[in-house]
Amino acid sequence: MHAYEAIEQSLTYIEEHLTKEISTEKLANTVGLSPFYFQRLFKRLVNKPVQEYVKLRRLAKVIENLKSTEQRILDAALDYGFSSHANFTRAFKETYGITPENYKKDLPMLNTFDKPEVSMNYVLVDEGVPLVVGNIVLE
């Protein structure tokens, strides 16, 4: 298994278990890596530490629920692993700059964190040869 495949597998695991407790050690064991190496690799490929990523994905799922249902803020937060209203409100406000209550009232557009694609799809480019991508020439 390539390193990026282990991270892809862990991202899928996270998505499927956002409503449960997710520890870095459990994720590392799930993909067969040491916790130390897993954390370094995850940060390098996802550009976020593991628990920060989990928090951002949980916030995104809560926002999705608040937009599409009449669920109470506290219930949505508890469903996605936040331990209390205060804990959720703090995380929400630090991330988005508004309280969950103000969000629910106005439903402004927020830039939520989506599951990244970490597969190693790339194009080899010869140096000195222009590359055309979407009507843009990269030299």
Outline where the language-model segments fall.
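The short coil/loop that forms the "turn" connecting the two helices of the helix-turn-helix
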Residues: 33, 82-83
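Key DNA-contact positions within bacterial/archaeal DNA-binding proteins
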Residues: 36, 85-86, 101
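…primarily DNA-binding HTH/wHTH and HhH modules…
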Residues: 1-2, 90-139
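Recognition helices and adjacent regulatory flanks at domain boundaries
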Residues: 11-16, 28-29, 37, 98
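Basic, low-complexity segments
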Residues: 25-46
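Hydrophobic/aromatic pocket-lining and membrane-interface residues
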Residues: 62, 84, 88
